[in-house]
């Protein structure tokens, strides 16, 4: 497990590279500050409205274990080799990043080719989801013909940090979804199997380390005092 810290102005941005027991998952989501409440891209994130943060998805998904076709029992995708494009990305905005008393609804950035939904949860947080409308708009693991390189994209959200977050770390649960194609077989229609990269502050346990849902530290920012 490797961790990186990126300091922009007075904002501390933490990120992590997640590895699995089988092969590095190449999962990397970090938070990059955008525009502060003062409208200045160089200011630290502050309490108030119009703070834009960008969740940078830096890689596609890889596998913790081989994917076996449920009908033919053949290996469809290999944990040691195959990588997959990002088809969906979700992030949960906590109440502490929704203004005083959680009254300011977060505003997601419009991403052409992706559908965006927002759902308010029972605890008052809001989960935002971007989903590619087709494979043509999915975020590939690397440029065509160059499997050794990775592409990235920033999913932006406008938030309002509450006064209780001054000088505090604010974490966001995020999840990246990729799809593995399962070919048609006799008595089995073609389908797609989701695999995940989840950043929620937990780690893979003995019972989950090979479930093709890698886990690691949640992307985090520190609000200016």
For every predicted segment, state its role.
Residues 1-10:
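Bacterial N-terminal signal peptides that target proteins for export
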Residues 27-39, 179-225:
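Extracytoplasmic/periplasmic copper-protein system
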Residues 44, 49-106:
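Low-complexity, serine/threonine/proline/glycine-rich extracellular segments that form mucin-like
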Residues 94-129, 219, 225:
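A surface/secretory-pathway sequence property marking extracellular, secreted
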Residues 11-20:
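Bacterial N-terminal signal peptides
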Residues 133-167:
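Low-complexity, intrinsically disordered segments enriched in Ser/Thr together with acidic residues
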Residues 48-54, 153-154, 169-172:
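Short, solvent-exposed loop/turn segments enriched in Ser/Thr/Gly
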Residues 21-27:
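Sec/Tat signal peptide C-region and signal peptidase I cleavage site
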């Amino acid at each position: 497990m490797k961790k990186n810290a990126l300091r922009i102005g007075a904002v501390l941005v933490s990120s992590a590279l997640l590895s699995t027991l089988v092969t590095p998952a190449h999962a990397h989501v970090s938070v990059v500050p955008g525009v502060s409440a003062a409208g200045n891209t160089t200011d630290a994130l502050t309490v108030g409205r119009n703070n834009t943060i960008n969740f940078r998805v830096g890689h596609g998904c890889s596998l913790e274990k081989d994917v076996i076709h449920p009908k033919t029992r053949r290996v469809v995708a290999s944990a040691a080799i195959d990588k997959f494009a990002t088809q969906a990305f979700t992030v949960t905005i906590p109440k502490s990043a929704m203004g005083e008393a959680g009254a300011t609804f977060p505003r997601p950035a419009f991403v052409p080719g992706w559908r965006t939904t927002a759902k308010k949860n029972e605890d008052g947080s809001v989960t935002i989801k971007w989903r590619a409308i087709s494979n043509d708009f999915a975020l590939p693991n690397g440029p065509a013909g160059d499997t050794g390189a990775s592409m990235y994209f920033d999913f932006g959200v406008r938030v309002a940090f509450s006064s209780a977050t001054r000088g505090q770390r604010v974490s966001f649960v995020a999840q990246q979804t990729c799809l593995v194609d399962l070919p048609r077989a006799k008595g089995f229609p073609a389908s797609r199997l989701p695999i995940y990269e989840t950043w929620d502050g937990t780690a893979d346990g003995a019972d989950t380390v090979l479930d093709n849902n890698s886990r690691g530290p949640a992307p985090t920012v520190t609000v200016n005092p």
